[in-house]
């Protein structure tokens, strides 16, 4: 799958392939808007299937992190999640209503490890 976007909606990362999105926060719920998401680089068919499977789990876990206040809309704080060989990073960037994400096909971030 090759979808290079001119607009980067998620967290900006220098690694490709990368899927980025700006999720809309409503209380402790997150909403995905397809027009606020995009790809940088190309994911293989296998990687695309991994992303399709992992994405709902990433979002559900981020919602739990909002509920526990580990992810706070008022303060920038990057969290890292791992699933299906993918690394997901998320941060509100203190935006009061958005959660920015980047999902990469790699391991090795040493921040807040959460295998979900």
UniProtKB/Swiss-Prot annotation:
Keywords: Toxin-antitoxin system. GO terms for biological process: positive regulation of cytoskeleton organization. Gene3D superfamilies: PAS domain (3.30.450.20). The keyword rRNA processing does not apply. SUPFAM superfamilies: YeeU-like. Belongs to the CbeA/YafW/YfjZ antitoxin family. Encoded by the CP4-6 prophage. An insertion element (ISX') seems to have deleted the end of yagB, fusing it to 13 insX' codons to make a 116 fusion pseudogene that may be expressed. The cognate toxin appears to have been deleted at the same time. Putative antitoxin component of a type IV toxin-antitoxin (TA) system; its cognate toxin is unknown. This is Orphan antitoxin YagB. The lineage of its organism: Bacteria, Pseudomonadati, Pseudomonadota, Gammaproteobacteria, Enterobacterales.
């Amino acid at each position: 799958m090759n979808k290079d976007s001119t607009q980067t909606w998620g967290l900006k990362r220098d690694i490709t392939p990368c899927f980025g999105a700006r999720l809309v926060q409503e209380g402790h719920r997150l909403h995905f808007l397809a027009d606020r998401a995009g790809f940088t680089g190309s994911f293989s068919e296998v990687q695309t299937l991994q992303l399709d499977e992992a994405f709902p789990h990433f979002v559900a876990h981020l919602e739990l992190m909002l509920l526990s206040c580990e992810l706070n809309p008022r303060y920038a704080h990057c969290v890292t999640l791992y699933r299906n060989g993918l690394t997901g990073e998320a941060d509100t960037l203190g935006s009061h209503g958005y959660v920015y994400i980047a999902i990469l096909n790699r391991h090795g971030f040493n921040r807040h490890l959460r295998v979900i």
